[in-house]
Curated annotation (Swiss-Prot):
Enzyme class: lyase
Name the record gives this protein: Probable enoyl-CoA hydratase echA14
Example GO biological process: fatty acid metabolic process
Biological function: Could possibly oxidize fatty acids using specific components.
Organism lineage: Bacteria, Bacillati, Actinomycetota, Actinomycetes, Mycobacteriales
Species the sequence originates in: Mycobacterium bovis (strain ATCC BAA-935 / AF2122/97)
Induction field: Induced in response to the thiol oxidant diamide.
Pfam families from the UniProt entry: ECH_1
Length: 256
């Protein structure tokens, strides 16, 4: 299997393009990838030349979720620290002070769906698939998924996804408000959309996003709501990770 830098970062015309880059494993989230994704977001935020961020996946998948071997590791050890490390990258996208776009080129599954949901806007490629899949694996949702999905599509569609296993292809994602549009080349479309903040004064872009966060739900910032959801989900997800049911489903998935 080829070796890759797990996260790539390039900057052009005031836009940072961040690519999760493990195509042989469908960009599954590992501790290393998660940490490098946070570092890439922080580099973009700290670069005065960057006005917006686009996140995408290398190869055919956007992000196939958490690395199953990482999820199943450390049997008997507390699961919470492992889960928090896997959350770290998409939480950095969620808290990014710059406008963010997820160019969803393929499957966004589990934690990969969280990565897409963490962005301000999602653009779907023709092969995009949005699939929570937590329940199918015997897992409780985590990383603020319950809050992010309800924010994006409302409570009924979010419950259809998380409780009933509903998935969304590119067209249905747009129909339900999960994605802004379908584009043959979602990265190109995302870069074109990002030309808006790229042409604006950076301080205005930063202030506009900060104000939208504050006014989305008066009385609290959306970041605070995401953190609360993450904390509420962490215990039940950790319990489910350590359950015999998850172990059996993990073993079955690894032997397919």
């Amino acid at each position: 299997m080829a070796q890759y830098d797990p996260v790539l970062l390039s900057v052009d015309k005031h836009v940072a393009l961040i690519t999760v880059n493990d195509p042989d494993r469908r960009n599954a989230v590992t501790d290393e990838m998660s940490a490098q994704l946070r570092a890439a977001i922080q580099r973009a935020e700290g670069d005065p030349d960057v006005h917006a961020v686009v996140v995408t996946g290398a190869g055919k998948a956007f992000c196939a979720g958490a690395d199953l071997s990482a999820l199943g590791a450390g049997v008997g050890d507390p699961a919470e620290p492992r889960l928090l490390r896997l959350y770290d990258g998409f939480m950095a996208v969620s808290s990014c002070n710059l406008p963010t776009i997820a160019a969803v080129n393929g499957a966004a599954v589990g934690a990969g769906l969280n990565l897409a949901l963490a962005a301000d806007v999602r653009i779907a490629g023709p092969a995009a698939l949005f699939d929570a899949r937590f329940q199918k694996l015997g897992l409780h949702p985590g990383g603020g998924a319950t809050w992010m999905l309800q924010r994006a599509v409302g409570p009924q569609v979010a419950r259809a996804a998380l409780l009933f296993g509903m998935c969304f292809d590119a067209e249905s994602a747009v129909r339900h408000g999960l994605a802004l549009m379908v584009a043959d080349d979602p990265v190109t479309a995302a870069l074109e959309l990002a030309a808006g903040p790229a042409a604006a004064p950076r301080e205005v872009v930063l202030a506009s996003k900060a104000t939208m966060r504050a006014t989305a739900s008066p009385g609290s910032l959306d970041l605070e709501q995401h953190e609360l959801a993450k904390r509420l989900e962490l215990g039940p997800q950790a319990k489910s990770v350590q359950s015999p049911e998850f172990a059996a489903r993990l073993a079955a998935a690894q032997h397919r």
